[in-house]
Swiss-Prot record:
Keywords: Isomerase, tRNA processing. One of its GO terms (molecular function) is RNA binding. The active site is at residue 51. One of its GO terms (biological process) is tRNA pseudouridine synthesis. Substrate binds at residue 109. This is tRNA pseudouridine synthase A. It catalyses: uridine(38/39/40) in tRNA = pseudouridine(38/39/40) in tRNA.
Length: 270
């Protein structure tokens, strides 16, 4: 039997998603909890690996098991063995044709950026922060140059293991709400550090360091050295993974973040 899980986690509490010998990752915590509940080791396959500090609101995994248990039993039973910084939101039996990674046709990330002269300790690890004003319109104009199918080598980490740097970026939205600016990135897939590198460039344009069309040159150059430094991970959230309707994957629970109403207005889930 194949089971899919929806997982939420506080990325600040872990050293990324992927299992490591030190055991301090989200995958390590989840598989330990699943093993405790199932009384047998279980291995998970994830929709998208996230880095240290990156949060998961709509992460999806699957695993195979011979155990026949009610779907909600997997939720309650696994959560009983998880730390408070990670939680299974739903469980669903899936056909063998479902694959958490390869069945997905799109991913959506949000970035919450706090723009204020003084940082807020209440937002530590929850939102990015910059103390200088930003030009929203300039960032929107710059984002236009990135939309479409492109070689995103200029925004790719040197550690990226993707087979190709070509991705299709469907949409970038920028929305101000009080002292926050919220960004939404939707694509078929993302390269390692791609969203944080895009954020670094958009913020550089917003600060007036470069004109909006600078991003067109960075993209065309296909050279990471042309782009701005990688932006902080704190405000980055994997919010949604899109799957074909036949799998009826439950929607992510975005209401667990304070600015969920802004995100819902910015991006009603498909």
């Amino acid at each position: 039997m194949r089971i899919a899980l929806g997982v939420q986690y506080d990325g600040a509490a872990f050293c990324g998603w992927q299992a490591q010998p030190h055991g301090k990752t989200v995958q390590d915590a989840l598989e330990r909890a699943l093993g405790e509940f199932a009384c047998v080791p279980l291995h998970t396959t994830v929709a998208g690996r996230t880095d240290t500090g990156v949060h998961g609101l709509g992460q999806v995994v699957h695993f195979d098991t011979a155990l026949d248990r009610a779907e909600f039993s997997w939720v309650r039973g696994t959560n009983a063995f998880l730390p408070p910084t990670v939680s299974v939101q739903w469980a669903k039996a899936m056909p063998d044709t479902f694959h958490a990674r390869f069945s997905a046709f799109e991913r959506t990330y949000y970035y919450a950026l706090y723009v204020h002269p003084v940082r807020s300790p209440m937002l530590a690890g929850r939102a990015g922060w910059i103390h200088t004003p930003l030009d929203d319109d300039a960032m929107r104009a710059a984002a236009v140059h990135l939309i479409g199918e492109h070689d995103f080598s200029s925004f790719r980490s040197s550690e990226c293991q993707s087979k190709t740097p070509v991705k299709h970026l469907y949409q970038i939205d920028v929305r101000r709400s009080g002292h926050f600016i919220h960004f939404r990135f939707r694509a078929n897939a993302f390269l390692h550090h791609m969203v944080r590198n895009l954020m670094g460039c958009l913020v550089a344009v917003g600060r007036g360091r470069y004109p909006a069309d600078w991003l067109a040159d960075v993209l065309a150059g296909r050279d990471r050295n042309l782009a701005a430094p990688t932006f902080m991970a704190d405000g980055l959230y994997l919010a949604h993974v899109g799957y074909p309707a036949e799998f009826a994957v439950p929607p992510a629970q975005l209401g667990s973040v304070p600015w969920s109403s802004v995100w819902a207005d910015l991006d009603p889930q498909p």
